[in-house]
């Protein structure tokens, strides 16, 4: 076993450890993209495909590694043996340098903006035992293919896992603000819902009081973001010519539905870990497009107007304007600084972004702000997606305090 001051391990050492009785003390983190991981990975490894906006928080110590783990079993392993287990980090091609001594924080012999370097530095700072696979996955697979799982094996395991509780994916975020300060009546009626938008709503009410006084116009003449109060404010709805209301809650009433003056779409989603908001993206996008075609305005709201409604708005911007998740988030936050999406909804958006990139003709180039621009047309991809809507179930409803898009080039 490598000494604690060593940064890297060889493929031979890793294979010997996988064969040993102590393999349960190894935690393998695959730092490649999710697509590469799904094709093949080292047996027992979990994929750590972290959005750059989250990676930065991990780098500066605002969240810990356990906070990004979705699997309860793996999270328990990390928490109980954080400084006892060996963390093995690997990418596709490997890292340069052999067994270099760590002279101080940030001395890992890989690019400083890589996931591996950030993880290595952070784990070392926490006193953990961590090495990077010098040879990389590609060389390891060539030497020891029997210790790798291919796409079919992974897919079979995912199907089996989905029959029970979906706990085999990475990317869960534990609460950074777990206590709620509003009454229970303000939260979702779901007994299992953590629905911490109520906590966030209270927090931002004090920190950014003016953000909640009126719905916020995200796309001029088309889309406003708001909260429960705004959805019941008839004067505000009239003032902004809002004729469509997208209600992203399971239990808030559609107050003016019976009048017939406003068209509603309700997406019954809480912030609980079991919720799949992505599966509703097609309907939500179609509803907003309908409002645009009718030269009307839509209000997208949830309880606090900072998480679920923001997620839907981001999906719309990504699909119709071809924005990346980072760019869409920056655009929305520039107009509404108190946005605070649920971590797992952000992960669903990351998957949605990947879907958009994989479909020819699904990406756009939009620099305008007009709601009737030609670049906001539904494509063939959307038609297919509407017919076969799928999504990734999240595993947390705990509110994330603040998202910050990357400006350092971290990917």
Curated annotation (Swiss-Prot):
Chain ranges of the Tyrosine-protein phosphatase domain: 214-358
GO annotations of cellular component type: cytoplasm; cytosol
Tissues where the protein occurs: Ubiquitous expression in eye and wing imaginal disks. Enriched in ovary.
Catalysed reaction equations from the record: O-phospho-L-tyrosyl-[protein] + H2O = L-tyrosyl-[protein] + phosphate; O-phospho-L-seryl-[protein] + H2O = L-seryl-[protein] + phosphate; O-phospho-L-threonyl-[protein] + H2O = L-threonyl-[protein] + phosphate
Activity regulation comment: Activity abolished by tyrosine phosphatase inhibitor sodium vanadate. Activated by rl.
GO molecular function: MAP kinase tyrosine phosphatase activity; MAP kinase tyrosine/serine/threonine phosphatase activity; protein serine/threonine phosphatase activity; protein tyrosine/threonine phosphatase activity
Broad EC category: hydrolase
Keywords, alphabetical: Cytoplasm, Hydrolase, Protein phosphatase
Pfam families named in the record: DSPc, Rhodanese
Region Disordered: start-end pairs: 184-209
Example GO biological process: signal transduction
Residue ranges of every copy of the Rhodanese domain listed in the record: 22-149
Coiled-coil features, chain-numbered ranges: none
EC number(s) given by UniProt: 3.1.3.16, 3.1.3.48
Residues forming the catalytic site: 302 (phosphocysteine intermediate)
Disruption phenotype: Homozygous embryonic lethal, while hypomorphic alleles (reduction in gene dosage) lead to extra photoreceptor cells in the eye, ectopic veins in wings and severe defects in oogenesis in females. Females with the germ line mutation lay only a small number of eggs. The laid eggs are abnormal, approximately 77% of the laid eggs are shorter and some display severe defects in chorion formation. These embryos could not escape the embryonic stage and progress beyond the two-nuclei stage. Null mutants are viable and fertile exhibiting a mild, but significant increase in wing vein material.
Low complexity compositional bias, start-end: 184-197
Primary subcellular site in the record, as a coarse category: cytoplasm
Localization annotation: Cytoplasm
Function of the protein: Negatively regulates the activity of members of the MAP kinase family in response to changes in the cellular environment. Has a specificity for the ERK family. Acts as a negative regulator in a variety of developmental processes including cell differentiation and proliferation controlled by the Ras/ERK pathway. Suppresses the photoreceptor cell differentiation and wing vein formation. Required for proper oogenesis and early embryogenesis. Functions autonomously in a subset of photoreceptor progenitor cells in eye imaginal disks.
Quaternary structure and interacting proteins, as annotated: Interacts (via N-terminal region) with phosphorylated rl.
Family listed: Belongs to the protein-tyrosine phosphatase family. Non-receptor class dual specificity subfamily.
Name of this chain's protein: Dual specificity protein phosphatase Mpk3
């Amino acid at each position: 076993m490598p000494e604690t001051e060593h940064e890297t391990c060889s493929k031979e050492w890793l294979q010997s450890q996988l064969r040993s009785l102590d393999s349960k003390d190894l935690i393998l983190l695959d730092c490649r993209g999710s697509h590469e991981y799904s094709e093949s990975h080292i047996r027992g490894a979990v994929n750590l495909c972290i959005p750059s906006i989250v990676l930065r928080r991990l780098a500066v110590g605002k969240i810990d590694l356990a906070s990004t783990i979705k699997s309860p079993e793996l999270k328990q392993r990390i928490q109980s043996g954080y400084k006892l287990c060996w963390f093995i980090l690997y990418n596709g091609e490997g890292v340069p340098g052999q067994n270099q001594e760590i002279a101080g924080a940030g001395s890992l012999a890989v690019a400083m903006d890589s996931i591996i370097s950030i993880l290595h530095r952070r784990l070392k700072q926490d006193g953990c035992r961590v090495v990077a696979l010098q040879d990389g996955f590609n060389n390891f697979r060539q030497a020891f293919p029997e210790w790798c799982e291919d796409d079919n094996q992974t897919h079979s395991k995912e199907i089996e896992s989905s029959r029970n509780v979906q706990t085999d994916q990475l990317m869960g975020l534990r609460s950074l603000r777990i206590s709620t300060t509003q009454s229970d009546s303000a939260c979702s009626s779901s007994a299992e819902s953590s629905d911490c938008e109520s906590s966030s709503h209270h927090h931002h009410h004090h920190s950014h009081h003016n953000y909640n006084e009126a719905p916020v116009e995200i796309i001029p003449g088309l889309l406003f973001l708001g909260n429960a109060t705004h959805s019941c404010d008839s004067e505000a709805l009239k003032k902004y010519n809002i004729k469509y209301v997208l209600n992203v809650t399971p239990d808030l009433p559609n107050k003016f539905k019976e009048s017939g003056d406003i068209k509603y779409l309700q997406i019954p989603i809480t912030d609980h870990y079991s919720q799949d908001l992505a599966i509703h993206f097609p309907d939500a996008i179609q509803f907003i497009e309908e409002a645009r075609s009718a030269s009307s305005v839509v209000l997208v709201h949830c309880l606090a107007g900072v998480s679920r409604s923001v997620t839907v708005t981001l999906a719309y911007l990504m699909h119709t304007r071809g924005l990346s998740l980072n760019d869409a988030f920056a655009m929305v936050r520039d107009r509404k600084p108190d946005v605070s999406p649920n971590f797992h909804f952000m992960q669903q958006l990351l998957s949605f972004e990947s879907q958009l990139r994989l479909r020819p003709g699904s990406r756009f180039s939009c620099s305008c702000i007009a709601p009737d621009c030609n670049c906001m047309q539904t494509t063939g991809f959307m038609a297919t997606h509407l017919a076969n809507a799928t999504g990734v179930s999240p595993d947390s409803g705990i509110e994330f305090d603040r998202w910050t898009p990357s400006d350092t080039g971290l990917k």
